[in-house]
A protein has these predicted regions:
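Short, surface-exposed loop/helix-turn segments at secondary-structure junctions
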Residues: 57, 112-124, 172-188, 217-219, ...
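Double-stranded beta-helix
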Residues: 132-136, 146-207
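A structural signal for short, well-ordered beta-strand segments
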Residues: 96-98, 139-141, 223-227
Length: 280
């Protein structure tokens, strides 16, 4: 992580990495995502699926495991340095979904993975020896373009350090009404307009949501990958059922396993060129 990236992430609570995926990587991931999204429910492999009646967003379960072109994104070389710094070389892949957002979907209301009154709880964001550490964060791999005015991901910059709970109706009053359309970006809110092949990194502490998707001829598709640290449990103990695990390669299996604090995973030892798996 460069000093500029570290400062921006600490200041705002997110990073927008541009043109992370190569042309070939993006094309393969787009093709795989399209197969999953357009697949009839009766053809879904075991443990795959989605709540097609959800009003604000469709999330296809275990998206990264659907195809190898999506699976390799979980440890893409361009994001690896960020995984290493945020987890202090102790990464655990603990969740994911393939997101699909179309015209007609409702506003995805603001939310976060923590509450200020619970600080630090089990989800922590802190600085250690000049490095950013975060025990729970997400990466958004964009498979389609988002332009200003389209809608999509919104966040409250700096909210990862908030000391007060957000008033529920602040920024988007009336959001709980059934016919509510949220398509504005009021002061204090940022709309992330990423292009296909970009990646957005965001601690789960950050308050975020999604504007109503406006284009009728285009949708928003993205792979969400969630990481925490290997020695802490902030979600399910076993988030991936056997039918999903059987599809994964050994490196991914190692990434999803819990691990002792004082031992580095094999993939970390190999990629970081460490002499020993013993962690200090």
């Amino acid at each position: 992580m460069t000093p500029e990236q570290r400062y921006f992430l600490d200041l705002t609570g997110y990073l927008h990495l541009r043109r992370v995926l190569s042309t070939n990587e993006l094309a393969a991931a787009q093709e795989a995502a399209d197969r999953y999204i357009t697949m009839p429910p009766e053809e879904w492999p075991p443990e795959f699926g989605a709540d097609l009646d959800r009003r604000d967003l469709t999330t296809y379960q275990h998206g990264f495991a659907f195809d190898r072109s999506l699976e390799v994104l979980t440890r893409h070389p361009a994001i690896w340095p960020f995984l290493m710094e945020l987890t202090n070389r102790r990464p655990r892949l603990n969740g994911d979904s393939l997101g699909y957002n179309r015209h007609g979907h409702a506003f995805h209301s603001l939310h976060a993975g923590w509450r200020p009154e619970k600080q630090p709880d089990v989800r922590r964001y802190y600085i250690e020896e000049g490095k950013i550490r975060c025990t729970d964060f997400a990466l958004f791999f964009y498979l389609t373009d988002v332009f200003p005015g389209d809608g999509g991901l919104i966040l409250l910059p700096g909210s990862h350090k908030a000391n007060f709970p957000r008033p529920r109706q602040m920024f988007y009053p009336g959001f709980e009404e059934e016919a509510y359309v949220g398509d504005t970006v009021p002061p204090g809110v940022h709309n992330v307009c990423a292009r296909a092949g970009d990646v957005v990194i965001m601690p789960k502490h950050v308050t975020h949501g999604a504007l109503s998707w406006k284009p009728r001829d285009r949708d928003r598709r993205f792979l969400i990958v969630r990481y925490n640290v290997q020695h802490m449990l902030t979600g399910q103990q076993h988030p991936f059922p056997d039918a999903i695990r059987e599809r994964l390669d050994p490196e991914t299996i190692e990434l999803i396993e819990p691990w002792p604090y004082f031992q580095y995973k094999g993939i970390v030892v190999e990629r970081e060129g460490l002499e020993t798996a013993k962690a200090g």
